[in-house]
Amino acid sequence: MFGSDNRADYDNGFPWHPHRGIETITYQIKGKTFHEDSEGHRGIIAPGEIQWMTAGSGIFHEEMPKPIYYGEENKYRERNDSNAGIQLWLNMPASSKMADPAYRSIRSDQIPQISDDYGNRIRIVAGTVNRVSGALNENFQYDLMQRIDPYYVEILMEPDTRTSLSVPEGHRAIMAIVEGSIRVNGSTFNEKNVAVLSKEGTDIFIDSQANSRLIFLAGKPLNEPIAWYGPIVMNTRDQLIQAFNELQEGKFVKNRNPVWQ
């Protein structure tokens, strides 16, 4: 999670850096973040929007949550008074780690939203809830979706209400409490806590104790070795060494024409 109301904390942003072997999923809650990558793609992530980037074989990018002057009409001239969001790293299977990079921009109005009996709002970025498919499932089907079957669901709860979800069979799941306080199957979790949930297809009952914002994340485990250092996640130490050698030699980016979606 990233978030601050102090401009000095986020004006520096996240300057140019590499990734390989993962997908980065950035969800903007407050403020705006400017993204640009080594393939020439650029855009603004506004509140309620998602950027789902496949680093694959290698990409450089920067994420700059600061005042932005973008385009001839200066459409984004306003200054951000605060900035908050969540970035998730999704490990790619060994067979996909050297895939071509891709960039997916998901607008807020592309994310399906449903309400439960208490009026709690459930936004479905990926996965299926109450037979409603998420934005990623509807707009961006690709091979990795079938392998991992990711769930990315935001829940906005009113105080003293209840909602429920099911952990899909065979999935590992966590729930991040971004704001508020909740009880999950009888256990209390507060702001910035993370609840690790069962992988046995169980139902989860969530009781809110305040206005709460939750992120439910789930996926099928890969059961593969992980070799991780800094922004690069591979399967073996030799692959990591190769990646950092390629960084020094200027050979890191393999594909200059990634998929823009």
Curated annotation (Swiss-Prot):
The keyword Metal-binding applies. Pathway: Flavonoid metabolism; quercetin degradation. A divalent metal cation binds at H17, H19, H61, E63. Putative quercetin 2,3-dioxygenase. GO terms for molecular function: metal ion binding; quercetin 2,3-dioxygenase activity. It catalyses: quercetin + O2 = 2-(3,4-dihydroxybenzoyloxy)-4,6-dihydroxybenzoate + CO. It comes from the Archaea. Its EC number is 1.13.11.24. InterPro entries: Pirin, Pirin_C_dom, Pirin_N_dom, RmlC-like_jellyroll, RmlC_Cupin_sf. Keywords: Dioxygenase, Metal-binding, Oxidoreductase. Its cofactor is a divalent metal cation. This is Putative quercetin 2,3-dioxygenase Ta0133. Belongs to the pirin family. It holds the Pfam family Pirin. Binds 1 divalent metal cation.
